[in-house]
């Protein structure tokens, strides 16, 4: 017969707590929706600014306004997502996607508004029927038909600003 070994008084691991666990901090879905609505508003304001000033703009001014719009869109979206979504990485990533799309659609909507103002509603209807992706093609290329590298740079700036600011603000907040 083997000798008996003494029993341990407690298990070697801590037992899980009883009761409900506290909810995770932040509201990632609400943060994404709030960022989306803010991005739509910033993009509409940018489109209105371009519509009001397109006759007096040089290429340098247009590119500067586009990059400024992308940074502003990313900063506002990132700030809101960081405040509401806290440390949720998925909310930060979706904020970057939303900010980049806001920069793209702000530019393409401005092109359509300028076309409607300068040539009338019939031109927009023809555009929709025969060349629906023309605003995106105009966003991607410059006047000579070459790739306009300010366009993807604006997307990168918007996404980086949104993710970076959301990450900084979200990680600064304390978890309960």
Where are these regions (language model features)?
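Intrinsically disordered, low-complexity Pro/Gly-rich regions
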Residues: 1-21
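Cytosolic juxtamembrane helix and N-cap/initiation of the first transmembrane helix
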Residues: 15-39
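Cytoplasmic membrane-interface segments at the C-terminal ends of transmembrane helices
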Residues: 22-23, 27, 49, 76-96, ...
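Transmembrane alpha-helix entry/boundary detector in multi-pass membrane proteins
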Residues: 29, 33, 50-73, 92
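Transmembrane alpha-helical segments of multi-pass membrane transport proteins and ion-pumping complexes
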Residues: 36-48, 74-79, 103-111, 159, ...
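Pore- or pathway-lining transmembrane helices of multi-pass membrane proteins that form conduits
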Residues: 66, 94-106
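Loop-to-transmembrane alpha-helix initiation sites
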Residues: 68, 72, 91-95, 147-157
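C-terminal binding/interaction regions
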Residues: 108-176
